[in-house]
A protein has these predicted regions:
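Short histidine-centered beta-strand/loop micro-motifs
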Residues: 20-32, 104-105, 123-128, 148
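Conserved hydrophobic/aromatic beta-strand scaffold that supports enzyme active sites
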Residues: 38-42, 101-103, 111-113, 134-136
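Conserved double-stranded beta-helix
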Residues: 1-56, 60-62
Length: 184
């Protein structure tokens, strides 16, 4: 089974110096389970100069949940409650050589597909005339359930779900009902 968690549009205008801080996604979301994926679809050519996503290879296997922080021009934790079960993310940028960081350039329509615990970030858009846009769609699988823990994004919480409940609802629609694998 597959549920739609939510979708989102990311835009980095030309000459945007601000980087997207290193983070993993799942701590931001009111969902728990291992089967949580992001698909980030390029709408424009994406290069390191325009702010391509960078990933730490294998970091989803760390099973570490890092404290969510505000994005954009703001700093700190002002939009997220502190959760004692989370840890602060290490200073990856200062220690880049300590990590196996990978990235790929994308043409419009190409996709990054990654686990919600994969640590990733992106540089600013240093291009003078090129906008960098990406459309992200997040899906959950069989083991994903609603999670009422502190520190998640307010817009992704639901008044219609209780802790541990399956996500099937108008808020998190079922998009693939079969639990067996394709081809089985």
């Amino acid at each position: 089974r597959v549920n739609l968690l939510y979708d989102q549009l990311f835009v980095k205008e030309p000459a945007t110096q601000h980087a997207t801080r290193w983070h993993n996604d799942q701590p931001y979301w009111a969902v728990r389970g291992w089967q949580v994926m992001s698909f980030w679809i390029a709408l424009d050519p994406v290069t390191l100069e325009s702010g391509a996503l960078e990933f730490i290879r294998g970091s989803h296997r760390w099973a570490r949940w890092f404290q969510p922080q505000a994005f954009g021009e703001t700093e700190g934790f002002d939009d997220y409650d502190d959760n004692p079960d989370y840890e602060l993310i290490p200073d990856i940028e200062s220690g880049r050589t300590d990590y196996d960081i990978v990235s790929w350039e994308l043409a419009p329509g190409d996709v990054y597909a990654f686990h919600a615990l994969t640590v990733h970030g992106a540089g600013g858009n240093l291009m003078e005339r090129v906008r960098r846009r990406g459309y992200a769609v997040r899906y959950t699988g069989d083991d994903a359930v609603y999670d009422t823990r502190a520190g998640t994004h307010a817009d992704l919480r639901s008044d219609h779900h209780i802790d541990g409940q399956r996500l099937d609802s108008g808020r998190f629609p079922l998009v693939w009902p079969q639990s067996e694998r394709l081809g089985d």
